[in-house]
Swiss-Prot record:
EC number(s) per entry: 4.2.1.-
Any Pfam family the entry gives: D-Glu_cyclase
Family note: Belongs to the D-glutamate cyclase family.
Entry keyword Lyase: yes
Main EC class the enzyme belongs to: lyase
Protein name: Putative hydro-lyase Teth39_1160
Keyword field: Lyase
Keyword Translocase in annotation: no
Organism from which the protein derives: Thermoanaerobacter pseudethanolicus (strain ATCC 33223 / 39E) (Clostridium thermohydrosulfuricum)
InterPro entries assigned to the protein according to its UniProt record, in alphabetical order: D-Glu_cyclase, Putative_hydro-lyase, UPF0317
């Protein structure tokens, strides 16, 4: 991906256009800073209520920002005129729980019975962390945020069940409390951390081997801090095995027209 710094000040519509044209194909952290990014889950209508209930019961990993009309790829509530078939840098196609393909455009997979869910993403509060002089390591290193499948069980709904996925950011020990305070203001994009410290306590064997994304350096004096993550539905798909589920590829988000501060409380 071209240097992110050139894209920090893009308007969301400009970023989506570059994504649609295939200019931006990598992770979206640091792009159109100040605007809310979202995870995608796309399912047939017959499974949509089950997933809606799953998200309602699991608001930390699955905070809903918008739900499309059946058969419409336009998320009218958060980005009028956008097209969820083309405006995400990379998609994943799961069939019966198996990752079948990663693609840059899902028009060939589109069905008229699809319903799309957009879920809050922790990339949204990273601008607030940076403004409080709290480092965001994956942005510093030009990597995708590391994500891990935990032993934290989600509340099941219909066919959907499985374990929570978390994202991890190393935070200097003296800034951990401030990081909790800052992110607590954004409950619509995962909010406060779900765990601080020992990764083994939540079933993570090694921080060097994330299940999704890239490992990042943890420096002396830093503490791993874990936030609920919108990649959770992908781990759930692997266990629940729906006929088909289309998602974003981890770290490759949909950029909405919502300003981050609109979601702050």
């Amino acid at each position: 991906m071209p240097e992110k710094i050139n894209y920090e000040n893009l308007k969301p519509s400009e970023a989506r256009q570059l994504i649609r044209e295939g200019v931006l194909t990598g992770p979206t952290a640091g792009i159109a800073l100040g605007y809310t990014q979202a995870n995608l889950v796309m399912l047939p209508k017959e499974l949509a209520y089950d997933f809606l209930l799953f998200a309602f019961r699991n608001p930390k990993p699955c905070p809903i920002l918008d739900v499309t009309d059946v058969g419409s790829p336009e998320p009218k509530g958060v980005a009028k005129g956008a097209d969820l078939r083309t405006d995400i840098p990379k998609y994943r196609i799961y069939k019966k729980g198996v990752l079948e393909a990663e693609v840059n455009d899902i028009r060939d997979y589109w069905r008229d019975d699809f319903v799309a869910f957009l879920l809050g993403c922790s990339f949204t509060f990273e601008k607030a962390l940076l403004e409080n002089d709290i480092p965001v390591r994956h942005i510093e290193e030009g990597k995708n945020v590391p994500m891990y499948i935990t032993n934290i069980e989600t509340r099941p709904a219909g066919i959907f069940h499985g374990y929570m996925v978390v994202s991890m950011r190393p935070i200097p020990q003296n800034l951990v409390v401030r990081a909790v305070q800052v992110t607590s203001r954004f409950p619509s994009v995962h909010g406060a951390p779900v765990h601080i410290g020992d990764p083994k306590a939540i079933g993570i064997a090694s921080l060097d081997k994330p299940d999704f994304g890239d490992p990042v350096e943890i420096k002396a004096g830093e503490v791993p801090v874990f936030w609920a993550c919108g990649v959770t539905p992908q781990a759930v798909a692997m266990k629940s095995k729906p006929e088909i589920m289309i998602t974003h590829s981890p770290g490759h988000m949909f950029i909405t027209d919502l300003k981050d501060e609109m979601l702050a409380c």
